[in-house]
């Protein structure tokens, strides 16, 4: 998956993991049980023909992906296109609502965008094998934090670049949990994708594109990292070792 990488600068038990449950896009809150709500992995698979249409692509649950060379690192395991797009203006802010996230799962929050065909994202997929990979992906934001927080309905925001061309976009958003990343595999990737119809904007076609899989390597310092290792300073103080967020530079207009 090649992505426009705009890195947002903010940066145990399966029950302790999380996923994006809902969002506020274009001023609309995509709330529970509305037809355009985000995919619900513990409800949608059991609804048969009554399953609501979604703006986000399917995910298997709240567990992680650990293989950076797997197709699952694109939008999560078994992901398929969603039928709807959320309208949003270029330059506007999108707020994503995560489910419960444990404080112990510290790591970067990263957002990418990929331009879909002019007909939309609803029938477009990055592919089911490593080649071709998802094209035209750029990182739009990233920040280092402890994740959304340890509270219910935690929020993470990103801004749609104001200069990109209007059209349909697939947004890949993830948290990389580093609590077990001292050896590979160990880092836990929690990707999810939703679909936008971007209005306004400019005429910029970002060129700093990457692919998923392909953007991350197991040897990247941001993938294999000991979050608990400390470095001694000249003042006999111990500080956490520096962390480098994996992937390309953040795109700016």
UniProtKB/Swiss-Prot annotation:
Compartments annotated for it: namely:
Secreted
Claim: Signal is one of the keywords in the record? yes
Instruction: Give any single GO term for biological process.
Output: cellulose catabolic process
EC numbers on record: 1.14.99.56
- Report the co-factor binding details: Binds 1 copper ion per subunit.
Q: What are the entry keywords?
A: Carbohydrate metabolism, Cellulose degradation, Copper, Disulfide bond, Glycoprotein, Metal-binding, Monooxygenase, Oxidoreductase, Polysaccharide degradation, Secreted, Signal
Q: What is its main location?
A: secreted
Instruction: Write down the chemical reaction(s) this protein catalyses.
Output: [(1->4)-beta-D-glucosyl]n+m + reduced acceptor + O2 = 4-dehydro-beta-D-glucosyl-[(1->4)-beta-D-glucosyl]n-1 + [(1->4)-beta-D-glucosyl]m + acceptor + H2O
Q: Which cofactor does it need?
A: Cu(2+)
Intrachain S-S bonds: 75-193, 163-253
Sites where a glycan is attached? 22, 143
GO MF annotation, one: monooxygenase activity
Q: Hey, what's the signal peptide range on this chain?
A: 1-16
Q: Which CDD domains match?
A: LPMO_AA9
Q: What class of enzyme is it?
A: oxidoreductase
Q: Which domain of life is it from?
A: Eukaryota
Residues involved in Cu(2+) binding: 17, 105, 190
Task: Provide the biotechnology use note.
Answer: Lignocellulose is the most abundant polymeric composite on Earth and is a recalcitrant but promising renewable substrate for industrial biotechnology applications. Together with cellobiose dehydrogenases (CDHs) an enzymatic system capable of oxidative cellulose cleavage is formed, which increases the efficiency of cellulases and put LPMOs at focus of biofuel research.
| Binding locations of O2 | 179, 188
Listed GO cellular component terms? extracellular region
Q: What does this protein do?
A: Lytic polysaccharide monooxygenase (LPMO) that depolymerizes crystalline and amorphous polysaccharides via the oxidation of scissile alpha- or beta-(1-4)-glycosidic bonds, yielding C1 or C4 oxidation products. Catalysis by LPMOs requires the reduction of the active-site copper from Cu(II) to Cu(I) by a reducing agent and H(2)O(2) or O(2) as a cosubstrate.
Family per UniProt? Belongs to the polysaccharide monooxygenase AA9 family.
Read off the PANTHER family from this record: ENDOGLUCANASE IV, PUTATIVE (AFU_ORTHOLOGUE AFUA_1G12560)-RELATED
This chain's protein is named AA9 family lytic polysaccharide monooxygenase F
Q: Which organism is it from?
A: Podospora anserina (strain S / ATCC MYA-4624 / DSM 980 / FGSC 10383)
The lineage, from the top, is: Eukaryota, Fungi, Dikarya, Ascomycota, Pezizomycotina
